[in-house]
Structure formats: C-alpha cells, structure tokens
Amino acid sequence: GLGVNFIENEGPVFTKPIDSPVDVNNLAHFNPSDLDYVYKAVTNIKNSLPDHIPLIGFCGSPWTLAAYSIEGRSSKDFAKTLNFIKANKSETHELLSKYTDACFLYLRKQVQSGADVIQIFDSWANLLKKDDLQAFSFDYVASLITALKIDPVTKNTPVIIFARDPDCDSEVLMTTGADCISLYWTMNNFDIEMSKNKVALQGNLNPKILLEDKETIKKETFKLLSKYKNYPGYIFNLGHGITPDIDPDKVKYLTDIVREY
C-alpha cells in the first residue's frame, strides 16, 4: 500500500507516494474488506437516523486520489503531480483506471451498508486545464457513474458530483452522468436554463459569507435562493466546506433563515 495517514490540520499524508511508473504497476489491488470499519460506521449512522433523513456516502474522485497519492500530501501547486502526468501519461491513465475500479467497489459497499445517496468529490479539479480536466478527471468520473448506474446494488442510488472551481462549462459536468451537480461558490455563470429538468443543482454559496454579520449573510443567502427559486430540484448548500474559523452559531442562523425563506 501507499501508507496513508490523516494528519490534523493537514489532511492525507502518504508515507510511500507514487514516484515512478513502477509504483503504479506495483500498486496492490483494492480489497473492499480492508475498509470494513467504514461500512460499519455507515450502518451505525443509518440506523441512528430517522427514516426521512437520507445518508450520503462519498469518495474522492479518481483524479483527486491520484493527485494526493502522487504528491504525497496536500500542496499549493501540486507540481510533482502535474510533472508526473505530463511525463507518464499512459501510467497515469493506468493509475486512474485502478482508482476508478476501487471507487466503484468502495461506493457499492457503502450503498449495501445503508448509504442512500453518493457524492463524488473532485477536490483538485482546479489543477487541470479544460482538455486535461476531461481526459484525466471527468472521463473517469463518467466511467465510475456508468458502473454505478448499471450495477444492481447501486443503479437506483442518486449520484452527486462536486468539482472544485473546474475549467469547464455546464454541459461538460452534465456529461458525467451525475444526477446532481454540486456547484462551487465561484460557478456563478452556470447555465441553469440549459440544465433545468435534467439534473438537480446544489450549493453555490460562498462559505466565507459566514464570517460576515447576520445582515450580510441574510442578504447573500436570499439572493442565491431567489436565483434558484424556480429551479426544480435545487438543494441549498454552501459552495465548499466550512472552515474552522466559522462560528457554529452563524451556521445555525443560516439554516434557520433558509427554512424561513
């Protein structure tokens, strides 16, 4: 294995990152049972929830997994990763294929364990320009979703795709086959008329708004809700994760005003 550890305030760190094509060839086949503790947690959480509250399972996209495992840890520019894929294109595609297969098995087990919805996080989509984004990320996301949609266990499970600040237009995200597109907070030019009645949309609010006063939070939130109020299947959410500097009371205020809208 690659020896991954999750370090507080840093994220995943690999003790044996991928440094060469040989490392890709030597990568062990993923065994879903190695993550039994995840599936047990999914089952326990599902059993603790009221019936009307769905549980979302998730995984990183094949590209995001590749970026972390080549770089070895989070980075400002992922220079090692970008240099690797440029110099080793065929091995990169081999790695992405392996990760796609692993993600499918991992998500399938999550659904078997109680997950009602699946979300795929392409957290490092912003590293790639348009053509590379399609070739190294979205093509593999599409393959993953296709596999989920034809498997008897997962075929009826809704799939959400989140891509961080992607260099693409609306149609490209829709071609992944996802049932719902989670919008990064900068994606303000997304063609909602084109996607209407085809996919659900989620998110788009800048999470840093929660650092502002309540009046500003309400103003920006209502602006967003007004934009999507006639969109069938819009799910209110932030356009990225909540950071530690955000006051939980502001989060409660946000959820309260959304429900009152």
Pin down the residues of each PLM region.
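Glycine-rich loop at the start of a catalytic domain that most often binds anionic cofactors/ligands
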Residues: 1-10
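Short, conserved acidic/polar surface loops in the N-terminal third of protein domains
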Residues: 1-2, 17, 66-70
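A gly/proline- and charged-residue-enriched helix-loop-helix capping module
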Residues: 9-48
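Active-site loop segments of alpha/beta catalytic cores
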Residues: 34-261
